[in-house]
Amino acid sequence: MLKHRMTFILVAIAVIFPFIGYLLSFYTDWLFFAETGFSSVFMTTVYAQTGAGLIFGLLLFAFLQLNLHYANKGSFPLSGIYIVGGGDIRINRNEAGRLVRPVGILISLVLAFLAGNWGAMRWEDLLLFANRVTVGMADPVLGKDVGFYLFSLPFVELLKSFAGFMVLAASVLSAAAYYVKGGITLDDRGAGVDPRVRRHLAVLVGLFGLVVAAGFYLESFSLLLSNNGAFHGAGYVDVHGRLMTLRILTFLTPVAGVVLALGIWRGDWRLALGPPVVIVALYLVGVRVYPGLLQKFKVAPNELTLETPYLENHLKFTRYGYDLDKIETVPFDVDTKLSAADIANNDATIKNIRLWDHAPLLKTYSQLQQIRTYYKFFDVDNDRYMVNGQYSQVMLSPRELSYADLPSKNWINERLIFTHGNGITFGPVSRISKEGLPEFFVKDIPAVSLADIKVTRPEIYYGELSNEYVVVKTKVPEFSYPTATGNINTTYAGKGGVPIDSLLKKALFAAQFKTEKILLSSDITPESRIIYNRNIKERVRTIAPFLSFDVDPYMVVDDGGKLKWIVDAYTFSGRLPYSRPVQGGMNYLRNSVKVVVDAYDGTVSFYVSDAQDVMVKVYSRIFPGLFQPISAMPADLRKHVRYPNQYLQVQAAMFAAYHMTDPKVFYNKENLWQVPTLGEKPMEPYYTIMKLPGEKVEEYILLLPFTPSKRDNLAAWLTARCDGENYGKIRAYTFPRDRLIYGPKQIDARINQDSFISQQLTLWSQRGSEVIRGSLLVIPIEKSLLYVQPLFLAADKAGLPELKRVIVAFGDEVVMEENLELALQRLFGARKSIGTAAAAAAPPGAPAAAGQPASSLAKEAMSIYQRALNLQRQGDWSGYGEELRKLEQVLKRMAQ
């Protein structure tokens, strides 16, 4: 008795224990959603999961029990189960028959639980179907609205799969029950099936025939999502071969199912075997063999002619899938007539050329501004601000807390004292000190502002490195920042986190986070709050798991000096007909949501930036309290919204081929583009501030060049606009195809071939310095192109990268100078807009201004020559080469 009781207790614990974990997770999730103000989102999801799970689970259980109940009724004449090959071994059927009902219930419960869990995981398909909308664009083959494919087809396929599993499971369990009861016999003479058993199984077979017919019907829609080799979507062979066969099979299969069921009912196995053979043969011939012959003998010799209408469908729907129709194509008639006056007229563009690369700058920030080992700069982001009245591109990096680098690791330090990061490092993209280091607008702890950007709330409780829970408002003061005289402490004053105001909550959170310290700590008071889901990516994904989120969240400073994160979110689908998928199967993508997360109190807001997106329309109907219009976003945050780099990369990868809208040109790949590669990596889009051709003012844009496929000259440059009413507008500026326009790889080769530059790089390397070549940027100015590449030097791989040189290429000239202003002076002559700073930075021998007297130039040349001789005598060959380079430029000026 005791043994049975212990067994029961152990089984009960094994069954209940997983549910305890589930209930704990459910409760903490509920508290999290209540804290963030999205309880309705949580409950909608819970209702959908619970409803779907119950419906699928109960349906399967009821159907299985109905069939098992019928199978278990009555008895059969045979008294025992004969084991084939087992000699005299027999099992008493009456004894075994008593187990049919309890075992059947147990198996039904297990299968129902699995089916319910499977259905609960497909809750999103259920909600999309229930809240579906029409798109207003029909597929060109079957005439169904695109909304059917996006919202209805996944759910209908789900029902078909469930129905098939339900009938198969009932058939197997019923057959097993009949075997145990004696309705099905197996012995050395063969198999025997009772007439009542045949009738039961015949009904199930007929039902399965309906499921197979539904599968053929749905497969016709799948043709529009297939890959036929030349393109994605239904082609000539699919429409004129497979589609007709699938339609025939859709109507023929139920008839075949009835005949098959009739044969089983009567026990006529010849009649029963005929229909499956016919269906399988028709499928193989009509869906496999005939289309292959049609492709080989009719389509292949006339592919372009026959496939043109379907290619047009493919082009249209792929362009719609990635929103490529909004890209405006503009001819860009490039020339090499850029002058000093043009440079002066585009001063804002020049000043905002990004010289600081992310990787070297992150390393430099870490060494100059990390302050303590437990702080860490995880990433550097680009943005734009009005700084001292000037529209400026900046680079910003949050100073987050790295728990892995805490000097003393214990629960109190990690959970109560060190709770947050502190402040940002913030500076211009192009300005450098005399030592080759970045300049700052905001730096240090506490924040020191060297411009009119103020940070009033520097604490970062929510970030990219905040992966652990913390408890705030405890008896233990929180560490804020270090000073020369000691540490400054703080107490959290925000509304983030969940109050731990009861013993029950303490116990539940202690169990959830697997530590008794939350329950036992005397430092935790009724006013204390536990903050979890602090990682901003995890935080927004928990609230909206149906969205995809950008890999690069970025921080902004609002007008009140508070730190906010902006995360780009995407809606997506893999169900758009005729659209080419990217890796992962997605063939519809929109950046239709911007998410703002407060770095101090964790407040999350979702804003719809693309109201035309059909997916976000449906999600807005499913979760009516989740999204706000973009107009509701505070104006000081809206001016920092930017076009996502990741999104433009996907669009550019598609636009490289799908800018060709003529099916013949697309088929022959006559004008295929590619993103240029430098080394082994393709170029990435980069942000800059510039005046677009035909526009009157500078604006913040995202830019990416293209080259023709397998060639290195430029074909076009793609730009996505980020500011105000122009946000989201994309232009492709195309170059003349009959002229050679140097591409990044060709400019890179010319830089490598320049004797002076290569000599300098070699000398630096020989002295033990690590030479880091920054990103090569293409900068359109007026009707010309500048190429700019920064050079960084570090004493070794662990050294501090310093920006020591800037290479600028224009036309056939390549120059390298200490900064961008000097390089532009050498190329175009002095500019008034460069002003005193450039003049002060210029060493003796810098090129003279336009219009300088010849006598003055001659004296300048002689001075340079004398310095070169002195350096030669001293053995300073690097300096000697530099002076000769300057002498060459002065002589060119004299020759003009």
UniProtKB/Swiss-Prot annotation:
Gene Ontology CC, one term: extracellular region
Regions crossing the membrane: 6-26, 46-66, 99-119, 158-180, 201-221, 245-265, 271-291
Lineage top rank: taxon: Bacteria
UniProt cross-references to InterPro entries, sorted A to Z: UPF0182
Pfam families linked: UPF0182
Keyword Transmembrane: yes
Membrane-related topology note: Multi-pass membrane protein
Primary site of residence: membrane
Localization per Swiss-Prot or TrEMBL: Cell membrane
Keywords recorded for this protein, A-Z: Cell membrane, Membrane, Transmembrane, Transmembrane helix
Family per similarity comment: Belongs to the UPF0182 family.
Protein name (record): UPF0182 protein GM21_2279
Organism: Geobacter sp. (strain M21)
